[in-house]
Amino acid sequence: ENMTYNQFIPYTDRLDYLAPLANNVAYALAVEKLLGVDDKLPERCQYIRVICCELARISAHLLGLGAFAMDVGALTVFLHTFNEREKVYNLIEALTGARFTTTYTRIGGLSRDLPDGWTDELSKFTKEVSEAIEEADKLLTRNKIFIDRTKGVGVITRDEAIDFGLTGPNLRGSNIEYDLRKAHPYLIYDQLDFEIPYGEVGDCYDRYLIRMEEMRQSVRILDQCIAKLPKGPINLDDGKIVLPHKQKVLSSMEELIHQFMLVSQGQNAPAG
């Protein structure tokens, strides 16, 4: 209550440390919708935000998959997924300056543009993580021991999933066809080609399969964003919403009010 909308952004990093970039984007979109500018964001900003969200999704699923595999005795998969997750954090650090507490979005845009060569590194990552996903698939999906320990285990029915308030892959694992990116498209998701996987019985095996396929679809989205990424501004051109650049504020006091300055040239005021 005692902060501006932008000052609250660092708190969103802590809501889910596995996907801080997605938290940043969700909060910014909520405030922008209240301000009535969510449909006015620059196209480049929207593409970069989608890239951030899908990187966050891959990062979270890699940890979930690795920890899950280790819990059922497949340590090798854990090592593979954490190796790929480290690459995600290297990309995030190059983009935001931090690995976890990113604080990357701003109301009306982003804190900074993509650094030079970053999309090339992202393209390299999508190829490498795709190979890692398929390697995990070979190790687990048709592994009899893994199937015995996950199939029919932890079943959550459709009604239970709704009653429990489940979201994301845990909800879709119970054969509920609901994903905000399709049900209520935001940013530029309606311009991208991707599919949403759903489970059949709602057991641990279904939830595993969904996370695997969601990572494949995230890679698909990232590749499209890299190919279509437009040039242009990353922030709204609205001084009432977007803060001036920090370098300008430090060098020119008037930048705080976007160069609006009253100048007196010493004329005498009219009589009366």
Model-derived regions: residue spans:
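Metal/cofactor-centered catalytic core regions of large enzymes
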Residues: E1-G272
